[in-house]
């Protein structure tokens, strides 16, 4: 039997843990795994692209556990009443190859993305950062808001989306959340949202090179949390922002970010640091208060490895329905796979009747 975590169980775990605590604990798990970076077998995700979206497989292993995530990205899905991003994942035992956990990762991907974003910002943003602009108010927006409000101390949130319905949705959800001490300001343009912000989060979905932020909007000292660019041909920042002499860019896994991140716009000699090096103190997060820092986030398999490991742990810690599924046959003789069927001869007889 294999542990199973569905959407209802994730909702139950969030209700018991609290979303802010869940994100904080997940960020700690991600940091722990990034700090043992060299123990992981890493590779860029395997992507199958179409004209309307992408389907990806994201593997990672530390030699003891193996994890993968299946995830899609289809920006036009919302027009058909479907999610832009859906995902599930597996955590397996390397020694036997047996899966230990099958889990939903649609909700969890949003949570781990917010956890990674705020983990990076805790090192890269100025320590007195209190104002965040949130450009793109779709599926990621609430999770980013909770993470940055509770874990970075954001007190003013400025919202803008080209689709006003997305901002309507976000405002409704933030009203329900009643985040103490957070002022929410609806803006009528990217420029008005960004003006005076300490942190700018871009989380847009269009599968194209979209110039969400232009050079004249960027002031000294700001931290850019660029979340939306995550596949070839899909970026959010004008390349001149990256060319600023005071810009410092941090990525998750450089070989993947060269393909999918904002730095796909740059040549191979463009210098970046990896988040693991920043967390370990081997690379600076910010040299001074005037540097423009950029977290070029595309999402990396190690974060999903951490998320699956965390989910399995709290699944066993918290009371409630500990679901398991018969994903694998249970055999008295591991060499007799057919025995699973012969234990129920009526099935074989039914098959014989069809053949006759």
Q: What label would you give each PLM region?
A:
Residues 1-110, 118, 128, 302-305, ...:
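N-terminal ligand-binding/catalytic initiation module
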Residues 151-177:
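NAD(P)-binding Rossmann-fold cofactor-contacting core
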Residues 137-138:
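Glycine-rich Rossmann-fold phosphate-binding loop(s) that bind the pyrophosphate
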Residues 182-192, 250:
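Short acidic-hydrophobic, aromatic-tinged amphipathic segments that line or gate anion-handling sites
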Residues 226-283:
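Rossmann-fold NAD(P)-binding glycine/threonine-rich loop
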Residues 124-131, 153, 219-220:
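Short helix-loop-beta connector
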Residues 191, 195-196, 207-223, 239:
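Rossmann-fold NAD(P) dinucleotide-binding segment
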Residues 201-204, 226-227, 252, 308:
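Short, well-ordered coil/turn residues at beta-beta hairpins
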């Amino acid at each position: 039997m294999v542990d199973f975590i569905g959407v209802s169980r994730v909702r139950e775990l969030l209700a018991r843990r609290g979303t802010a605590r869940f994100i904080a604990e997940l960020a700690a798990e991600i940091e722990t795994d990034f700090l043992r970076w060299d123990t992981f077998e890493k590779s860029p995700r395997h992507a199958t692209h179409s004209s309307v979206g992408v389907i990806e497989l994201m593997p990672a292993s530390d030699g003891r556990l193996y994890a993968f995530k299946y995830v899609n990205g289809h920006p036009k899905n919302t027009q058909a009443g479907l999610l832009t991003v859906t995902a599930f994942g597996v955590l397996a035992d390397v020694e036997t190859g047996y899966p230990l956990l099958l889990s939903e990762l649609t909700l969890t991907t949003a949570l781990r993305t917010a956890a990674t974003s705020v983990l990076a910002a805790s090192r890269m943003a100025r320590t007195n950062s209190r104002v965040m602009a949130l450009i793109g108010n779709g599926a990621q927006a609430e999770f980013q808001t909770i993470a940055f409000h509770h874990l970075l101390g954001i007190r003013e949130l400025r919202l803008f989306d080209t689709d006003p319905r997305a901002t309507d949705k976000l405002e409704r959800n933030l009203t329900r959340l009643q985040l103490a001490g957070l002022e929410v300001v609806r803006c009528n343009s990217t420029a008005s949202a960004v003006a005076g912000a300490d942190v700018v989060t871009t989380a847009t979905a269009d599968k194209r090179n979209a110039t969400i932020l232009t050079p004249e909007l960027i002031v000294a000292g700001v931290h850019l949390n660029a979340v939306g660019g995550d596949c070839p041909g899909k970026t959010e920042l004008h390349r001149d922002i990256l060319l600023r002499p005071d810009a410092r860019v941090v990525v998750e896994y450089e070989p993947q970010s060269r393909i999918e991140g904002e730095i796909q716009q740059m040549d191979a000699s463009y210098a970046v640091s990896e988040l693991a090096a920043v967390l370990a103190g081997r690379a600076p997060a910010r040299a001074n208060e005037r540097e423009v820092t950029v977290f070029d986030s595309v999402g990396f398999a190690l974060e999903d490895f951490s998320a699956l490991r965390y989910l399995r742990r709290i699944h066993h810690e918290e009371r409630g329905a500990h679901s398991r599924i018969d994903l694998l046959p249970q055999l008295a003789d591991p060499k007799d796979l057919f025995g699973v069927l012969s234990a129920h001869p009526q099935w074989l007889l039914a098959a014989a009747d069809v053949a006759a």
